[in-house]
Design a protein with these regions (language model features):
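Glycine-rich anion-binding surface patch
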Residues: 1-144
Length: 144
């Protein structure tokens, strides 16, 4: 078996663990301290799974409409008397991890520009709210 197939199987296995933890929290009918315990336990498990190796392809989604955008995607510099935008550094992996966990616990996806990172914090986007509304059974959109 090739290394690529092994890596894909490993990532798929990790993804299933993470998705299971998120589903457990989202489906949970507990409140108060019980909810805090369930959520904090799930966050610990997810953080263990989000290795640098696993995060590498997610970090590649930073700064794209197919992934998620940030306020660090571009940097404006003055070149020859004109301001030009250049690719910025983006956010470090630890901040992206925190925002990623927060977004997924709200039911947002990592793809499709469903959240942005601004000032190191996660904010749902119009696309994210639209996706959440699409998941609500019985909700009908009526734009007249």
């Amino acid at each position: 078996m090739s290394n690529i197939v092994k890596a894909e199987e490993k990532f798929l296995s990790i993804s299933k663990v993470i998705d299971s933890e998120i589903s457990t929290v989202l489906a949970s009918n507990v409140n108060g301290f019980q909810k805090a315990f369930v959520m904090s336990s799930a966050i610990d498990i997810i953080k263990e799974q989000l290795s640098d190796e696993y995060m590498k392809p997610i970090m590649a989604l930073q700064g794209t409409s197919l992934g998620f955008k940030t306020d660090q995607d571009t940097v404006k510099k003055q070149v020859g008397g004109k301001w030009v935008a250049e690719k910025g550094p983006g956010y470090p992996m630890e901040i992206v991890k925190e925002c990623l966990i927060e977004a997924t616990f709200l039911g947002l996806e990592v793809t499709g520009n469903q959240f942005n990172i601004i000032g190191g914090n996660m904010y749902p986007t119009r696309e994210g709210f639209g996706a959440l509304l699409d998941k609500m059974k019985g909700l009908k959109k009526n734009f007249t």
